[in-house]
């Protein structure tokens, strides 16, 4: 899954779950 940190950086969490980091 592609998710975004609070600072707008993109994170790949392997598609297992979607989270908002930071």
Curated annotation (Swiss-Prot):
Keywords: Cell outer membrane, Disulfide bond, Ion transport, Membrane, Porin, Transmembrane, Transmembrane beta strand, Transport. It is found in: Cell outer membrane. Its main location: membrane. The keyword Iron-sulfur does not apply. One of its GO terms (molecular function) is porin activity. GO terms for biological process: monoatomic ion transport. It is a multi-pass membrane protein. GO terms for cellular component: cell outer membrane; pore complex. Structural rigidity of the outer membrane of elementary bodies and porin forming, permitting diffusion of solutes through the intracellular reticulate body membrane. Belongs to the Gram-negative porin family. This is Major outer membrane protein. It comes from Avibacterium volantium (Pasteurella volantium). The lineage of its organism: Bacteria, Pseudomonadati, Pseudomonadota, Gammaproteobacteria, Pasteurellales. The gene is ompH.
């Amino acid at each position: 899954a592609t998710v975004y940190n609070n600072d707008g950086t993109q994170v790949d969490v392997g598609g297992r779950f979607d989270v908002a980091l930071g």
